[in-house]
């Protein structure tokens, strides 16, 4: 009785208490079987001549998940509606010139960037044709934009300095 109580307690703790028919209950009564007798052809049991059984996966283990194509440890990417809208185009950055070219043009030509007086000097900063071409200008300075004339004037300033405008350069 003590063994039955211990077995019932252990089964209840393990959660494996199962009802069975009385025929399946083992007892100590002699059933006419000799456990030490040689096994007959109908006996089922261990055969030392057979190779070991392959390891089988446990029955309760779910199949391994297929490769999902992403790292499950990382958060999912943001949905397209949560992405920030494209940035608006910033206004162009104003160009910082090394001198005040408008002040020099005001002194040289009265601020007229397309002046051609016929004296061999052209545009608001009064370029000669040779100086204009040598410093990256194309066509005539009188037909060039203010920005183009200033670009060429910056090249002249780097090669000749402000003395290229001997009277009006000091105003820049």
UniProtKB/Swiss-Prot annotation:
Belongs to the transglycosylase family. Rpf subfamily. It comes from the Bacteria. This is Resuscitation-promoting factor RpfE. Interacts with RipA. The gene is rpfE. GO terms for biological process: negative regulation of gene expression; positive regulation of gene expression; quorum sensing; regulation of cell population proliferation. It comes from Mycobacterium tuberculosis (strain ATCC 25618 / H37Rv). Pfam families: Transglycosylas (PF06737). It is an enzyme of class 3 (hydrolase).
